[in-house]
Amino acid sequence: MKVIFVADLHYALKQFDWLLGNAASFDAVIIGGDLLDLGSDLHLDLQIVVVEKYLRLLRQKSLLMVTSGNHDGDNRNEADESVARWIRESKAEGLFVDGDSLELAGALVTLCPWWDGTVTRAELEAQLARARQSVQGRWIWIRHAPPAGSPVCWTGHQFAGDESLLEWIQRFTPDMVFSGHIHNAPFYAGGSW
């Protein structure tokens, strides 16, 4: 199985175009969060319309998995935490999103949403506990932020990983975790891809 994982596209349409042009070369395409750009002058609602079109086209070329990142929130929950409702609403045939788990080449792949506070953190923890019951072989997580202490969370000045994710890895023991979020980690001594 041939899979491509990307993250942190931040509404860079040339990167979405490249991905669209190459998606058919892969059995699965995984986008690990930050599809949108909160710092853009273009309103999020307009970015969402364009990115949803890319997602529709991508899922026609390859199995597509998408998780949210800290730039993708378009709504607030009851606890005033950022949530990417638009990603969950984009779910369609061939497109798996936040909260889903699917079998892929003998492994269970769990798509973990961005958490922004105690409520969304507890929801993700419950999702992982439920998914753990279905694991029969390997277990892979897709999560925007990397675990605390890992080389891919090094910013050049500090480790900026997710402490909760590290705890969950120790508790639930997935075989692999794909993440993005820290853009410059590969370019610093002590960092990594």
Language-model region placement:
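Extreme N-terminal starter segment of soluble prokaryotic enzymes
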Residues: 1-4
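Conserved catalytic scaffold of divalent metal-dependent phosphoesterases
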Residues: 72-164
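Active-site metal-binding loops of divalent metal-dependent hydrolases
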Residues: 7-10, 33-36, 70-72, 100, ...
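Short, solvent-exposed loop/turn segments at secondary-structure junctions
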Residues: 13, 38-39, 149-151, 186
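Short, conserved loop/helix-junction motifs that constitute active-site signature segments
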Residues: 23-24, 55-61, 133-135, 169-172, ...
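Conserved beta-sheet core of the metallophosphoesterase superfamily
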Residues: 65, 154-193
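Core catalytic region of metal-dependent phosphoesterases/phosphodiesterases
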Residues: 11-104
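Short, Asp-centered acidic motifs that coordinate Mg2+ and/or phosphate
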Residues: 27-28, 65, 138-140, 175-176
